[in-house]
Amino acid sequence: MAKKSMIARDVKRKKIVERYAAKRAALMEAFNAAKDPMQRLEIHRKIQALPRNSAPNRIRNRCWATGKPRGVYRDFGLCRNQLRERAHKGELPGVVKSSW
Protein backbone atom coordinates (compact mmCIF):
# COMPACT_ATOMS: atom_id res chain seq x y z
CA MET A 1 0.00 0.00 0.00
CA ALA A 2 1.30 3.42 -0.95
CA LYS A 3 1.57 6.24 1.56
CA LYS A 4 -1.75 8.00 2.02
CA SER A 5 -0.06 11.36 1.56
CA MET A 6 1.19 10.34 -1.91
CA ILE A 7 -2.27 9.16 -2.94
CA ALA A 8 -3.80 12.40 -1.62
CA ARG A 9 -1.19 14.44 -3.50
CA ASP A 10 -2.11 12.67 -6.72
CA VAL A 11 -5.84 13.26 -6.15
CA LYS A 12 -5.09 16.95 -5.57
CA ARG A 13 -3.11 17.09 -8.82
CA LYS A 14 -6.00 15.52 -10.75
CA LYS A 15 -8.35 18.23 -9.47
CA ILE A 16 -5.90 21.01 -10.39
CA VAL A 17 -5.38 19.56 -13.89
CA GLU A 18 -9.14 19.43 -14.39
CA ARG A 19 -9.54 23.03 -13.20
CA TYR A 20 -6.90 24.46 -15.56
CA ALA A 21 -7.41 22.12 -18.55
CA ALA A 22 -9.43 24.55 -20.67
CA LYS A 23 -7.12 27.51 -20.00
CA ARG A 24 -4.00 25.45 -20.70
CA ALA A 25 -5.49 24.03 -23.92
CA ALA A 26 -6.43 27.52 -25.15
CA LEU A 27 -2.94 28.85 -24.42
CA MET A 28 -1.29 25.89 -26.13
CA GLU A 29 -3.49 26.34 -29.19
CA ALA A 30 -2.59 30.04 -29.34
CA PHE A 31 1.10 29.19 -28.85
CA ASN A 32 1.08 26.71 -31.75
CA ALA A 33 -0.81 29.13 -34.01
CA ALA A 34 1.44 32.13 -33.28
CA LYS A 35 4.13 32.88 -35.87
CA ASP A 36 5.78 35.95 -34.34
CA PRO A 37 8.58 34.94 -31.91
CA MET A 38 7.76 37.73 -29.46
CA GLN A 39 4.11 36.71 -29.40
CA ARG A 40 5.13 33.09 -28.80
CA LEU A 41 7.39 34.22 -25.95
CA GLU A 42 4.54 36.14 -24.35
CA ILE A 43 2.19 33.15 -24.56
CA HIS A 44 4.93 30.87 -23.25
CA ARG A 45 5.31 33.08 -20.18
CA LYS A 46 1.56 32.82 -19.56
CA ILE A 47 1.79 29.03 -19.76
CA GLN A 48 4.70 29.07 -17.32
CA ALA A 49 2.67 31.23 -14.94
CA LEU A 50 0.10 28.44 -14.56
CA PRO A 51 0.54 26.18 -11.52
CA ARG A 52 3.11 23.44 -12.03
CA ASN A 53 0.65 20.76 -10.95
CA SER A 54 -1.83 21.83 -13.64
CA ALA A 55 0.22 19.97 -16.26
CA PRO A 56 -1.33 16.57 -17.04
CA ASN A 57 2.03 14.81 -17.24
CA ARG A 58 2.48 15.27 -13.47
CA ILE A 59 -0.34 12.84 -12.69
CA ARG A 60 0.95 9.43 -11.66
CA ASN A 61 -0.88 6.35 -12.87
CA ARG A 62 -1.79 4.46 -9.66
CA CYS A 63 -3.55 1.22 -8.78
CA TRP A 64 -7.06 2.01 -7.57
CA ALA A 65 -7.02 -0.86 -5.07
CA THR A 66 -3.64 -0.34 -3.40
CA GLY A 67 -2.39 3.03 -4.63
CA LYS A 68 0.87 1.51 -5.87
CA PRO A 69 2.55 3.66 -8.54
CA ARG A 70 4.44 1.00 -10.46
CA GLY A 71 3.41 -1.98 -12.55
CA VAL A 72 -0.06 -0.58 -13.25
CA TYR A 73 -2.02 -1.99 -16.20
CA ARG A 74 -3.98 0.80 -17.91
CA ASP A 75 -6.80 -1.44 -19.08
CA PHE A 76 -7.75 -2.38 -15.52
CA GLY A 77 -6.20 0.37 -13.40
CA LEU A 78 -4.70 -2.35 -11.22
CA CYS A 79 -1.12 -3.14 -10.29
CA ARG A 80 0.29 -6.45 -11.46
CA ASN A 81 -0.16 -8.13 -8.06
CA GLN A 82 -3.82 -7.20 -7.75
CA LEU A 83 -4.43 -8.08 -11.40
CA ARG A 84 -3.05 -11.58 -10.82
CA GLU A 85 -5.02 -12.12 -7.60
CA ARG A 86 -8.30 -10.91 -9.04
CA ALA A 87 -7.85 -12.81 -12.30
CA HIS A 88 -7.30 -16.06 -10.36
CA LYS A 89 -10.42 -15.38 -8.29
CA GLY A 90 -12.42 -14.67 -11.46
CA GLU A 91 -13.26 -11.10 -10.47
CA LEU A 92 -12.14 -9.66 -13.82
CA PRO A 93 -14.67 -10.51 -16.53
CA GLY A 94 -13.15 -11.77 -19.77
CA VAL A 95 -9.70 -12.44 -18.31
CA VAL A 96 -8.60 -16.04 -18.71
CA LYS A 97 -5.30 -17.71 -18.01
CA SER A 98 -3.49 -18.29 -21.28
CA SER A 99 -2.49 -21.74 -22.42
CA TRP A 100 -1.15 -22.89 -25.75
UniProtKB/Swiss-Prot annotation:
InterPro entries: Ribosomal_uS14, Ribosomal_uS14_bac/plastid, Ribosomal_uS14_CS. It comes from the Bacteria. One of its GO terms (cellular component) is small ribosomal subunit. It holds the Pfam family Ribosomal_S14. Keywords: Ribonucleoprotein, Ribosomal protein, RNA-binding, rRNA-binding. The keyword RNA-binding applies. One of its GO terms (molecular function) is rRNA binding. Coiled coil: none annotated. One of its GO terms (biological process) is translation. Binds 16S rRNA, required for the assembly of 30S particles and may also be responsible for determining the conformation of the 16S rRNA at the A site. Belongs to the universal ribosomal protein uS14 family. Part of the 30S ribosomal subunit. Contacts proteins S3 and S10. This is Small ribosomal subunit protein uS14. The gene is rpsN.
